[in-house]
Structure formats: C-alpha cells, structure tokens
Amino acid sequence: MPFTFSHPAIVLPLTFLPRQWFSLTGLVIGSLTPDFEYFLRMRIKSNYSHTIDGLFWFDLPLGLLLAFIFHNIVRDSLFDNLPTILKSRFSAFRQFDWNGHFKRNWLVVTISILIGAASHIFWDSFTHDHGYFVQTIPALQNSVDFLGRQIPMLKILQHGSTLLGGLVIVFAIYKLPTNKNENENVNLQYWAILAGLTLTI
C-alpha cells in the first residue's frame, strides 16, 4: 500500500475550490482514516475501513474523533515544538477555532471526511492485490523485469505514488506563507516522550 501519510496529496487539488466548499481538516484526516484499522489491529489487515460501508460507520466517526482530538489536544503543543522551518508555516493555523468552525460547518466537514476517505480507497484500488482496478485492468497484474527480478506493477505504483505524494505534500508545505517572528526553541523532551510512546505502542 502507499505510505499512509502520502495520501493527503490526492485531496490537495480540492483546496483550490472556494473555501466554503471544503474542510481541509476533513479532507486530510479523511484521507488517512482507512489505514487506522491497521494501527488498531497492529497488523496489515483491513476488513472494514477500505469498504463502501466502512466509509460511513468506520472512517467517518473515526475521522470526526481524530479531528477533535487533533485540534483540542494535539495541535498547539505539536506546532509549538516543530522545527522553525515548519513552525513558521503552520503558526497561522494555531489560532483556528475548530469547535466553532465545526458547529457552523458540520455538514461540510462530514462530506470532506467522506471525500478524503473515498480518495484513499480509490488510490489503494490501484495498488492492492485485491484492489478493484488491479482486478479489472490486466496490465496492473503484470510484472516488470528489473535486474533479473520480477517486480509487480502494483508494487511499482505503490512506491512510485508514495514518493510522488510525499513530494507534493512537501511542496505544498513549502509554499505556505511564513511567519518570521516564530522563535526557534524546540522542546527535545516533548519529542523524546512522543518517540517513547510511539515505540511503546
């Protein structure tokens, strides 16, 4: 599968639409949620989150939960401890009133999460063994000879699209306006604790 955190790249073009038509939080978190079944199971197995039914009863409620956790618990401390090159670009989002925004735009947020999750499933359908397009497009079931090894086309698409998606996200972040007044302090203890929790999990 493509790397989970490359998935938001596919929804970024939607940010060129009028601002009131979409929720960036909803699109980005929605594009990530289908892979959270892997994290919850602690193994690469998904019975629900990559299905049409799962969009509504797994991805949508989980996406809403993650959005509230991120904006109310994670966001400010994370942004405060980012390296300056990132902090200076994300500082504008620190004062965002998510709870108020959601009350006024709950339908837009909901639809954005569903669109984000659907985009994830669409992308994976080209790169999973049992993906819809892998099963219906014979060329995706072929292999390519590389240095004497047979590499499946879907693996090439997996890694190639992951790299391309990552580059798109890096470029999008680079193009964000910067705040030159951000201090350069980084709390190493914060990152040590975060790394410890990640390794523990």
Identify the residue ranges that each predicted region occupies:
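N-terminal membrane-targeting hydrophobic helices
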Residues: 1-201
